[in-house]
Amino acid sequence: MSFGLAIRLKGARMQIFDKGKIYNFMGMRWVFFLISFVMFFGSIALLCTKGLNYGIDFAGGTLIQVRYHDKDAPIDLIRQRFATNEILKNASITEFGSAKEITIRYTSSSDSLGSSPGDVVAKMLQGTGEFEIRRVDIVGPKIGSELREKGIMAVVVSLVLILIYIGVRFEWRFALAAIFSEIHDVVIVMGAISLLSIDVNLDTLAAILTVLGYSLNDTIIIFDRIRERVKESKFIKLFEVINESVSLTLSRTIMTSVTTLLAVLTLFFYGGDMIHGFSIIMIIGILIGTMSSVFIAAPMLSWFRFSVESYRASVVAKELRKKEKEKLRAMYEKGTV
């Protein structure tokens, strides 16, 4: 399928694809169904076997922030010092904002280094340069478990609200297609998190919910255009209407995805180690969400027996009922009823 990409400026408006051309997206749906099938069940297999690597926010542990004044943080030397300590030898040491500042994370119990883990770390770092302990955060296992439960609940509640919203704004078949698409996106993103061993923390949860929002936005734009074209299009077959609708929204979809990806790529390359996990999840999620909106959510309407002719008939019947009510109201106001 050739799109013939060409950017043209018309006044202040940018148009990437030929507005009058209809691309056969649905002709490629089985290819993308196969790709999605492999990624979806591959992600489930990863989650069942490898699982997720919960960070301090969800598993409990300690975070210590250290800033060096006279030089960049000697991370390799710090790792050598920590290698002699049973608790800190597996600690995560990453830059935080600049090369002079680092965070030290470990998931052992809060009392594993005694009552003051900051003092223990400061003692072990003596001789590595002039530094200060700027922050010590401790999350207990119980609090971590509660945060994990609330995080799962946040995703579930968001999916339920999406189902209700689309069901009210469109109809139940659109709602189910959107929910399946969103679940598809979440599972694949979580599979990528497991595959890449990204720590699951509050930042990760924020990235997942943001991905849900972007994917839903794309899906609603396409569904809204499908609903509009079902009423007005010359086509009577569902897949032809979907091709027309997606083609009409293609420039907007591509521009939104590309501009968002550019911002996220900037975070990935210049945001530092602390935000790498968030940016990777966003990159994967935007790509998967864009694909699922076009090739998963839209074709699913046919699975739920959505019919263009039946929908048009229901719209006509609804308009007739509306006109009849308006006629009766007018007659009542005139006193003729």
What is each residue range found by the language model?
Residues S2-V337:
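A structural signal for conserved, well-ordered secondary-structure elements
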